[in-house]
Amino acid sequence: MAKIVVTGGQALQGEVNISGAKNAVLPILCATLLADAPVQISNVPHLHDVITMVKLLSELGAEVTIDEGTLAKGRSILVDPRSVTHQIAPYELVKTMRASILVLGPLLARYGTAEVSLPGGCAIGSRPVDQHIKGLQALGAEISVENGYIKATSHGRLKGGRYVFDMVSVTGTENVLMAAVLAEGTTVLENAAMEPEVTDLADCMIALGAQIEGAGTPRIVVQGVQRLGGGHHAVLPDRIETGTFLVAAAMTGGSVTVRRARPETLDAMLDKLTEAGATITTTADSITLDMQGKRPRAVSLTTAPYPAFPTDMQAQFMALNCVADGVGVINETIFENRFMHVNELLRLGADIQVEGHTAIVRGAARLSGAPVMATDLRASASLILAGLVADGDTTIDRIYHLDRGYENIEEKLGALGATIQRTA
């Protein structure tokens, strides 16, 4: 099984291009099922989850053509949904990636029927699908859960309605939003997720002919249309990858510019990096972080839905706090079981105390390399970050988690001066 070996001690310097956002491209690929003509998606990252989603679309009968492109420009995917013949997303594919549930709304809206296996693909606690089910029922769907599958049908077109999400759910918002686009009449979604990836999904569907207002706010209004046509959409940059490289620069006392970024989607993260002592300058599509000659200061944070601090950056900032000056308190309010990286960071010499959903991190003068094991996507990133500043070699096992969400991370870090390699 492949591993990554990191040798610590190098301050990162240089520039890095940010890839398309994993959490945007997956729902956007699902949204192509709503169209009745080919849809081209560009700036698609080279990720394992994207490959899985392409397999799922192909399993449903869609014709998918991939232009591999380059690391510099990203890949392009052309989806022709006119050949879709199946409306069942099988367990074999769904179990490896939770985002597979996002075909439920499009299949139901377009074909009046959908069967999607209950999802797997993530070890960071329960992520209930009830928000998806309730939202689709509010549009007139009949839904049952039988034999491990969500089975949804509608008699004729879905009907527009008003739905208030019990809790903020990104994928729940996306699933119901996609279904509402082809529903008859007006749909109002309240307490909707405001993440930039939701806005990007809406922008894609608007380009195909959807009528959506309010994406990026808690209230989204959709005027249903009869059909979506073909078109093109470029995926927005990945704000979590952006944040990960900025934290790497801060931890190593480096100076890094991230290009093809969207600074306006990173306010909470940039505020915390400034609090940690970094000097940050931004342009419309780049961010430069300078921490040369300085040790980061510890920061305290609480994860919450956008625009607050993202749970997907919690592990990386914990790694920063492990070598920072002072004590940082991290409260995780989004997911349970999202401190699984703590035991691995402890193996490197970190000083972390966990009490329920709170981690208290006391900065250590140094970490020392050791063999560690990745437990989920963002945890694996935090271990690489810790390895960048640890004495000696840090060997990270189970890096298949990493390939689900980071495109060529060892190449990108290596280009910034890190000593990092993938081994068989």
UniProtKB/Swiss-Prot annotation:
Enzyme class name: transferase
Domain of life: Bacteria
Entry keyword set: Cell cycle, Cell division, Cell shape, Cell wall biogenesis/degradation, Cytoplasm, Peptidoglycan synthesis, Pyruvate, Transferase
SUPFAM superfamilies tied to this protein: EPT/RTPC-like
GO molecular function: UDP-N-acetylglucosamine 1-carboxyvinyltransferase activity
Binding residues annotated for UDP-N-acetyl-alpha-D-glucosamine, in chain numbering: R98, R127, P128, V129, D130, Q131, D312, I334
GO cellular-component term (any): cytoplasm
Residue(s) carrying 2-(S-cysteinyl)pyruvic acid O-phosphothioketal: C122
Catalytic activity: phosphoenolpyruvate + UDP-N-acetyl-alpha-D-glucosamine = UDP-N-acetyl-3-O-(1-carboxyvinyl)-alpha-D-glucosamine + phosphate
Keyword Cell cycle: yes
Pathway where this protein functions: Cell wall biogenesis; peptidoglycan biosynthesis
Binding annotation for phosphoenolpyruvate: K22, N23
Cell compartment(s), UniProt: Cytoplasm
One GO BP annotation of this record: peptidoglycan biosynthetic process
Entries under Pfam families matching the protein: EPSP_synthase (PF00275)
Active site residues of this protein: C122
Keyword Cell division: yes
Protein's job: Cell wall formation. Adds enolpyruvyl to UDP-N-acetylglucosamine.
Record protein name field: UDP-N-acetylglucosamine 1-carboxyvinyltransferase
Source species of the chain: Xanthomonas oryzae pv. oryzae (strain KACC10331 / KXO85)
